[in-house]
């Protein structure tokens, strides 16, 4: 027999009630309201009634005078004309869960109800605080949230802030402008990017879903904690699964960044909070912009794309380098990528362009290394910067061909050890799911060239992962039998296949580690351990003697046995020197100290010490030649 109170009318009467009643009465009302759900519903139905109605426990609908006031020819303090109600926008349904900030009503001395315009901001909060004896604005706002009926209920926002598991899903920011469109981003054109660390916001009115496992810092300024004029809607469920580098690039950030979008009349504090939510979605932003200086990320290919001559120089330097890219990517295959990017730049942009950027950056880095010191330090810094620019698209590794995976690992090895480790993990996971088995349907649709490159790419990954894991003191993940294909044979264009040489070195190193440092090896007898030690040394020496003739003396420390005059082959020579002496250190150095007593005989301990000393002498001799003054003239004295 009694209609439910309108949510807007209840809000107006609540403000009036807060300013007209004493602190003791308000405290009692709050306790009485939160005591039970049933009592709160009973209070909310007659909270808007005047004092006379309350004294008689008469329920007042707030729109027309109650029966008691009509009977005694009185006027309700909460009365509003029907004309004023029809001119207001309708209250949203419960499914939409949209609440409108109402206008404030006050009663003048003559008993006539007047309408006070609602402020556009929440600067009325200090006045509300002054009317409360405790001065706790947060409690006032809780009362405001509780002062609703059961149909148009508003959640208590401030209670959720006290928990670490912050969930703002029941919160909706609403202002007085009911026609304001919610903030949304049209990301329909980004569907081809693969799995992103967020779901695109919806473009229609819907219930927000902000389930972010990060506590949000809240300011003590209550005026910055309430919504302003326009409605703000986010639908960004964050998936905690996946690698930590599930990233987006700078161009995506420019599209979804709140600073680049109109957020209505949100306060600066609220805008900072929204921006912090976006930045918490990924920690990639700082790493992608690291080392770029003033360069624009979305134009990191501009330095070479319009310069055909520079592209040819970088490409030639990249594929002339016997180690790295040329071991698993042919120049003709790369030329097809370049032509595809020029003819249809939007089709394979995420896969082809990062590949081209990486090859160009790697080639420029080689050119800069060859021209030193005549080129100066500026060229060297520019080469490092361009390598970092190519690395900034490394999140595309998960959605790129396998060739790009290994390519970006090669570049990252020159720059950042941490990034290199992460890319190796991505590549191993990807390669294990695509092992190019004979039973795989993809194998039947592969061209001969792509099948050849796929095999070499997987073995190149093996050669990198084994050495990298052992350097970090971890057992290798990949083994020589991890794929159905045998080791690559001699390359097509040269008698020396450097990929085969790298894989043989990885095999020798992995075999030595398993024979000497595995859990089973630690339980061996002294004779078995010494036999395995000599067998590991024999495998390493067999690898050294299989190198080209000019590299077979990398174990000697005498001057003249290692040629470093040629700038084009110096990096290759030093790489082979490093691989050999690093293996000597891994095999023998742990047995040179007193801690090996009882594990090997004294003869083998001294033999290990002798090999390590000779290895150190050879490395120091080469380092002295490199750092000598002769290198400043562009050549090294033999």
From Swiss-Prot:
It is found in: Nucleus. Pfam families: Zn_clus. Induction: Expression is induced by methionine. Nitrogen starvation induces expression of terR and promotes terrein production during fruit infection, via regulation by areA and atfA. Iron limitation acts as a third independent signal for terrein cluster induction via the iron response regulator hapX. GO terms for molecular function: DNA binding; DNA-binding transcription factor activity, RNA polymerase II-specific; zinc ion binding. Its main location: nucleus. It comes from the Eukaryota. Residues 50-76 bind DNA. Terrein shows anticancer activity on various tumors including cervical carcinoma, ovarian cancer, and head and neck cancer. The secondary metabolite acts as angiogenesis inhibitors through the inhibition of angiogenin secretion. Terrein also has anti-inflammatory activity. It shows an alleviative function of age-related inflammation characterized as an anti-oxidant and might therefore be a useful nutraceutical compound for anti-aging. Terrein may enhance osseointegration by decreasing the level of ROS and has a potentially synergistic effect on osteoblast differentiation. GO terms for cellular component: nucleus. Disruption phenotype: Impairs the expression of the terrein gene cluster and subsequent production of terrein. Keywords: DNA-binding, Metal-binding, Nucleus, Transcription, Transcription regulation, Zinc. InterPro entries: AtrR-like, Zn2-C6_fun-type_DNA-bd_sf, Zn2Cys6_DnaBD. One of its GO terms (biological process) is positive regulation of metabolic process. Transcription factor that regulates specifically the terrein biosynthesis gene cluster. Recognizes CGG direct repeat consensus sequences in the terrein cluster forming the high affinity consensus motif TCGGHHWYHCGGH. This is Terrein cluster-specific transcription factor terR. It comes from Aspergillus terreus (strain NIH 2624 / FGSC A1156). The gene is terR.
């Amino acid at each position: 027999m009694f209609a439910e109170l309108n949510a807007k009318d209840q809000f107006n009467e609540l403000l009036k009630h807060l300013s007209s009643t004493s602190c003791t009465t308000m405290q009692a009302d709050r306790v009485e309201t939160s005591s039970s759900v049933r009592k709160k519903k009973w209070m909310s139905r007659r909270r808007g009634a005047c004092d006379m109605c309350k004294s008689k426990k008469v329920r007042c609908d707030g729109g027309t005078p109650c029966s008691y006031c009509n009977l005694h020819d009185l006027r309700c303090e909460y009365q509003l004309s029907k004309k004023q109600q029809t001119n207001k926008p309708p209250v949203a349904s419960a499914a939409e869960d949209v609440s409108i900030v109402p206008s404030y009503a006050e009663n003048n001395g003559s008993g006539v109800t007047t309408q006070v315009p609602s402020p556009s901001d929440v600067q009325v909060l200090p006045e509300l605080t002054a009317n409360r004896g405790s001065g706790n604005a947060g409690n006032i706002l809780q009362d405001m949230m509780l002062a609703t009926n059961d149909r148009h209920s508003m959640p208590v926002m401030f209670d959720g802030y006290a928990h670490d598991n912050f969930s703002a899903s029941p919160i909706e920011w609403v202002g007085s402008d009911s026609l304001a469109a919610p903030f949304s981003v049209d990301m329909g054109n980004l569907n081809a990017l693969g799995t992103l660390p967020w779901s695109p916001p919806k473009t229609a009115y819907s219930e927000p879903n902000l389930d972010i496992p990060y506590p949000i810092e809240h300011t003590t300024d209550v005026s910055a904690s309430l919504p302003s004029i326009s409605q703000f809607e986010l639908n960004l469920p964050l998936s905690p699964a996946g690698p930590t580098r599930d990233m987006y690039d700078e161009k995506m950030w420019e599209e979804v960044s709140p600073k680049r979008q109109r957020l209505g009349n949100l306060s600066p504090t609220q805008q900072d909070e929204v921006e912090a939510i976006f930045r918490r979605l990924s920690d990639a932003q700082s790493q992608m912009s690291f080392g770029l200086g003033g360069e624009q990320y979305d134009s990191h290919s501009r330095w070479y794309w319009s310069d055909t001559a520079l592209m040819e120089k970088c490409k030639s330097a990249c594929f002339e380098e016997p180690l790295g890219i040329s071991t698993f990517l042919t120049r003709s295959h790369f030329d097809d990528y370049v032509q595809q990017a020029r003819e249809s730049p939007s089709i394979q942009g995420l896969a082809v362009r990062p590949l081209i950027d990486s090859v160009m950056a790697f080639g420029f880095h080689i050119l800069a290394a060859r021209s030193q010191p005549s080129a100066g330090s500026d060229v060297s810094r520019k080469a490092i910067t361009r390598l970092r620019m190519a690395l900034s698209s490394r999140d595309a590794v998960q959605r790129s061909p396998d060739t790009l995976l290994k390519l970006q690992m090669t570049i990252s090895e020159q720059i950042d050890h941490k990034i290199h480790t992460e890319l190796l993990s991505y590549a191993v996971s990807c390669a294990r799911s695509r092992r190019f088995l004979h039973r795989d349907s993809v194998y039947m649709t592969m061209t001969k060239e792509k099948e050849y490159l796929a095999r070499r790419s997987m073995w190149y990954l093996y050669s990198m992962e084994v050495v990298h894991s052992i350097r970090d003191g971890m057992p290798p993940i990949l083994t020589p039998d991890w794929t159905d294909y045998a080791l690559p044979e001699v390359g097509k264009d040269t008698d020396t296949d450097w990929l085969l040489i790298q894989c043989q070195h990885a095999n020798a190193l992995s075999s030595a580690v398993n024979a000497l440092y595995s859990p089973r090896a630690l339980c061996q007898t002294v004779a078995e351990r010494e036999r395995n030690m000599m067998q590991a040394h024999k495998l390493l020496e067999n690898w050294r003697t299989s190198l080209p003739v000019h590299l077979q003396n990398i174990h000697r420390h005498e001057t003249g046995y290692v040629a470093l005059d040629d700038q084009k082959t110096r990096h290759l020579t030093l790489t082979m020197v490093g691989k050999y002496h690093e293996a000597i250190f891994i095999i023998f150095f742990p047995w040179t100290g007193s801690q090996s007593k009882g594990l090997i005989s004294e003869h083998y301990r001294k033999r290990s010490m002798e090999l390590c000393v000779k290895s150190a002498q050879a490395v120091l001799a080469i380092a002295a030649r490199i750092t000598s003054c002769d290198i400043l003239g562009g050549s090294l004295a033999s």
